UniProtKB/Swiss-Prot annotation:
The keyword Heme does not apply. One of its GO terms (biological process) is regulation of ER to Golgi vesicle-mediated transport. The gene is SCFD1. This is Sec1 family domain-containing protein 1. Belongs to the STXBP/unc-18/SEC1 family. One of its GO terms (cellular component) is Golgi membrane.
């Protein structure tokens, strides 16, 4: 039983840890990286393409790279000077143009030795191209290692991953749902998704049991992934799933469940105005790959009349796992975040004053007998204060960071009345009585941008059982056009709804999920950084979104019409027969939900909240691309133009 417990602990070794371990091993010339080794690291350069850069940047900081001996990290296609006495570690996709450039590096004898690591498996023919180039350049002995790393996915959280950031339009919702997509193009999209999912499971060290809905892109992914896993398991000598793949062995003593869902089962959630911190940051700010970019205006004070306003400073902040405030509050409702930032600031000020006081005591002259007698009592205190100084400075950095980020979010909430949108949409999605008419909000010039209004109307249109009459729809369309909205997204959603109506009933979103709590108390203090006047303090009630509900049915083996006809694949079974859902229906302990067609932080947060109530269970959320509502509306608009 102890072994089983240890295996479950290994399951908790998150995908982030596993991918980080794999990267560190690669940077250590594919030898396991030992944390406490005393020797100096071997100095080397890291050469990556944009794909490699996107995989590494959310996981390893520049300081961590330096600790691993990376003195320089350069893009493969940048102009690079020769450094003939230093080894180079390459981390790139095995594309034609990347291979050509690597062969050119060999010919130009840029580095002492070459460790070639491919993000995804390289084909035999491309490998031969490299071998020929090495031969021609008399550099065979310098090519030290060639490795397939199977790391073709991006980990953003301990329990969240996305397929790619570069070329994401290739696997986007629009790409999959284009009416004019050819079979060959669709095959390419599916192969791209399957390649990444295969890499994900190799890194996880587990072969999943796969469930998916029928007649969707998710089913096409399931069929191809099952085949790819099956072929790899059959080739016992070269199987990537035998033995100790990454130090932590198998995922756990029980295999994980992979639930493949199609974006089309729920188009309302990606358009929804949200109320939790991380999802809001993604919705209203420029936030991707865990980095938020803010524009801070440097003001126009004291500038002579008619002078140009000063340029806005761009600032970027990394929101990482070591940021305790972010880890604790990224899923909290926004007013709670504002309150917590304020509390942190006050506790920091108290500590800061203490340090100043102790420092001034130490600086006093000897004549002051009172001060000298206090000195001995205070030495211990001062030592602890000074030793905690770096910690205090880090705390101050995080407080400043979150003050800036939360202030930027708050500006959007107030300027666009996002609390009103959030509350109203929640009522629509949960079929609660609406307190004011939809037309009033659309026609209110002070409530939100044209895009906010379009999002609200689309959610109403998607969620309503009975589509509005033609006359009503014309009235809504006129109000939307008057508000400056582009009607293309509605065009697409109308076609989509007509199509899904034939297929199935619309997704239900459960009962009401918010209750207004009056305005904030603490944060309303005049001393607060955040003037929350007029912003509702809405408290969230846990309510499962469609993706979470589907996962719950399949993970707990519940019988439900929504998921009863989901296909079942077990790549370890000799004959692939999807009708054979096993009779012994044991609930799963670990599951991966993957959304084909794009995901969002609202769904991710909903799953995180759901699993909190399930002891000893783990969930990972993945998606083919991560978009916010603005990016999603743009795709719907392009589809509506067709």
């Amino acid at each position: 039983m102890a072994a089983a417990a240890a295996a479950t602990a290994a399951a908790a070794a998150s995908i982030r840890e596993r991918q980080t371990v794999a990267l560190k091993r690669m940077l250590n010339f594919n030898v396991p990286h030992i944390k406490n080794s005393t020797g100096e690291p071997v100095w080397k350069v890291l050469i990556y393409d944009r794909f490699g850069q996107d995989i590494i940047s959310p996981l390893l900081s520049v300081k961590e790279l330096r600790d691993m001996g990376i003195t320089l990290h350069l893009l493969l296609h940048s102009d690079r000077d020769p450094i003939p006495d230093v080894p180079a570690v390459y981390f790139v996709m095995p594309t034609e143009e990347n291979i050509d450039r690597m062969c050119q590096d060999l010919r130009n004898q840029l580095y002492e030795s070459y460790y070639l690591n491919f993000i995804s498996a390289i084909s035999r023919s491309k490998l031969e191209d490299i071998a020929n180039a090495a031969l021609a350049a008399s550099a065979v002995t310098q090519v030290a290692k060639v490795f397939d790393q199977y790391l073709n996915f991006i980990t953003l959280e301990d329990d969240m991953f996305v397929l790619c950031n570069q070329n994401k339009e290739l696997v986007s919702y629009r790409a999959i749902n284009r009416p004019d997509i050819t079979d060959t193009e669709m095959e390419t999209v599916m192969d791209t998704i399957v390649d990444s999912l295969f890499c994900f499971f190799v890194t996880l060290g587990a072969v999943p049991i796969i469930r998916c809905s029928r007649g969707t892109a998710a089913e096409m992914v399931a069929v191809k992934l099952d085949k790819k896993l099956r072929e790899n398991l059959r080739d016992a000598r070269n199987s990537l799933f035998t033995g100790d793949t990454l130090g932590a062995g198998q995922f756990s003593f029980q295999r994980p469940l992979l639930v493949l869902v199609d974006r089309n089962i729920d188009l309302a959630t990606p358009l929804h105005h949200t109320w939790t911190y991380q999802a809001l940051v993604h919705d209203v700010l420029d936030f991707h790959l865990n980095r938020v970019n803010l524009e801070e205006s440097s003001g126009v004070e004291n500038s002579p009349a008619g002078a140009r306003p000063k340029r806005k400073n761009k600032k970027s902040y990394d929101l990482t796992p070591v940021d305790k405030f972010w880890q604790k509050h990224k899923g909290s409702p926004f007013p709670e975040v504002a309150e917590s930032v304020q509390q942190e600031l006050e506790s920091y000020r108290a500590q800061e004053d203490e340090v100043k006081r102790l420092k001034s005591i130490m600086g006093l002259e000897g004549e002051d007998e009172g001060a000298i007698s206090m000195l001995s009592d205070n030495t211990a205190k001062l030592t602890s204060a000074v030793s905690s100084l770096p910690e205090l400075l880090e705390k101050k950095r995080l407080i400043d960071l979150h003050t800036n980020v939360a202030t930027a979010v708050l500006e959007h909430i107030k300027a666009r009345k996002l609390d009103v949108y959030f509350e109203y949409e929640e009522k629509i999605m949960s079929k609660t009585t609406l307190d004011k008419s939809l037309l009033d909000i659309i026609s209110d010039p002070d409530a939100g941008t044209p895009e906010d209004k379009m999002r609200l109307f689309l959610i109403y249109y998607i969620s309503t059982q009975q589509a509005p009459s033609e006359a009503d729809l014309e009235q809504y369309k006129k109000a939307l056009t008057d508000a400056g909205c582009n009607l293309n997204p509605l065009q697409y959603i109308k076609q989509w709804k007509a199509f899904t109506k034939m297929a199935s009933a619309p997704a239900s979103y459960g009962s009401t999920t918010t209750k207004p709590m009056g305005l904030l108390s603490r944060v309303m203090n005049t001393g607060s950084q955040f003037v929350m006047e007029g912003v509702k303090n809405l408290v969230l009630k846990q309510q499962n979104l469609p993706v979470t509900r589907i996962l719950d049915n399949l993970m707990e083996m519940k019988s439900n019409p929504e998921t009863d006809d989901y296909r079942y694949f077990d790549p370890k079974m000799l004959r692939g027969n999807d009708s054979s859902v096993p009779r012994n229906k044991n609930p799963f302990q670990e599951a991966i939900v993957f959304v084909v067609g794009g995901g969002n932080y609202i769904e991710y947060q909903n799953l995180v909240d759901y699993i909190k109530g399930k002891q000893g269970k783990h969930i990972l959320y993945g998606c083919s691309e991560l978009f916010n509502a603005t990016q999603f509306i743009k795709q719907l608009s392009q589809l509506g133009q067709k």
